């Protein structure tokens, strides 16, 4: 299995994990359920961990596909830059989520509202960045989604 295979296998996890966690967190906030909010924090931590191999296999995947017909090196570079920004955002989200979990377990208290709000904002940013990165990545092999595509 090549880096391209692994990258394609895992590349939806950062996007879907961020969005799923955001939905769970939003639901927990609406229900005022600390347990649901803590579940979303766990989702963000797991997503952050699984984002690492996605990012690390990106260069190997780029090397494999860069010589294929119809593949744009410029789009690969755009995707790489977007992926770096997204990776940093998701890792920050995961670290803050882990910190919030640790603080709530240590103090045996409910999550503070500022913690939940901070994670919510980071999750929205990470989800948006993930969608942006995925959109650029999709253009690498799917010419039909590139700007200016005509039949």
Where are these regions (language model features)?
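Polytopic transmembrane helical bundles with strong interfacial aromatic enrichment
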Residues: 1-151
């Amino acid at each position: 299995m090549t880096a391209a295979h692994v990258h394609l296998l895992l590349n939806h996890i950062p996007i879907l994990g961020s969005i799923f966690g955001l939905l769970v967190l939003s639901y927990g906030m609406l229900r005022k359920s600390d347990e649901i909010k803590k579940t979303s924090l766990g989702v963000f931590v797991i997503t952050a961990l699984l984002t690492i191999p996605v990012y690390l296999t990106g260069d190997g995947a780029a090397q494999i596909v860069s010589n294929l017909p119809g593949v744009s090196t410029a789009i690969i570079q755009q995707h790489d830059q977007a992926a770096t920004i997204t990776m940093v955002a998701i890792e920050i989200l995961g670290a803050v989520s882990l910190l919030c979990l640790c603080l709530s377990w240590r103090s045996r208290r409910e999550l503070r509202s500022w913690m939940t709000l901070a994670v919510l904002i980071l999750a929205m940013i990470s989800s948006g960045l993930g969608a942006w990165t995925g959109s650029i990545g999709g253009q690498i092999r799917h010419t039909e989604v590139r700007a200016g595509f005509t039949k």
